[in-house]
Amino acid sequence: MNKIRCALIGPGNIGTDLLYKLRRSDILEPVWMVGVEPSSEGLARARELGLKTTSDGIDGLLPHLEADDIRIAFDATSAYVHAEHSARLTARGVRVIDLTPAAIGPFCVPPVNLDAHIGSNEMNVNMVTCGGQATIPMVYAVSRVQPVAYGEIVATVSSRSVGPGTRRNIDEFTRTTAGAIEAVGGARQGKAIIVINPAEPPLIMRDTIHCLTDDAPDVAAITASVHDMIAEVRKYVPGYTLKNGPVFDGKRVSIFLEVEGLGDYLPKYAGNLDIMTASAARTAECIAAAMRAGSAQESANA
């Protein structure tokens, strides 16, 4: 069966790493890479890999959507331009996976709520943030056992792995992640902190998650839930590792993670970017599988 064809908007670190992951997919075919700088290294690399490219932004892509049968588009640009991109793409029937903090569509954290989004046929889903993808599964692992009054995460990332787009979006990062800790993670109140570490050599992404439960924590149930969720995330992020915990102190549950990347395009220390691209690829593959199943059902009914 033919692969589902995709476009990538934004040829920076995230867009380029995502391209490498999509090229390995059994169900997705990356066809277009869209940028705004003719001299972009990401566009040049995409051309070398056989993709069609444009430096005219989304205006350069739209006329080709139908002819090239683009069904899914990934937006790895900026929260400030995503609204326009999404409106123009979804109006043409293209499903959008948003890797910016814009959060126009509902938050998607694959092991927590991806199945629900596929069932509701959402046209735009938001991948939260790198910190959100790394930590929200842990908040949810606690909240699915018992109510969580407060969830706080600290994402520590290497300065080298944080590009200009992420730096411009720091405020959006913290707001979006905190909102998703509540909406997806299940905490009644959420807080997110990002620490950009300039250490050399660069450090692998580290995440700390603190949850305050309403009642005394069920140690055995929460520990089992956390380990089950670690295994789920490792299916698509093999470098997702529990370094310590869960640690229990009164009503506080603390979990300590490390996220190492696959090293597709980005260095392995850039696990913060790798978990975003891996989560987006996982989401798109599940959406594409649902598209295929729907097409097969239509053919059977014809």
From Swiss-Prot:
NAD(+) binds at residues 161-169, 272. GO terms for molecular function: acetaldehyde dehydrogenase (acetylating) activity; NAD binding. GO terms for biological process: catabolic process. It catalyses: acetaldehyde + NAD(+) + CoA = acetyl-CoA + NADH + H(+). Its EC number is 1.2.1.10. The active site is at residue 130. It is an enzyme of class 1 (oxidoreductase). Belongs to the acetaldehyde dehydrogenase family. This is Acetaldehyde dehydrogenase 2. It comes from Cupriavidus necator (strain ATCC 17699 / DSM 428 / KCTC 22496 / NCIMB 10442 / H16 / Stanier 337).
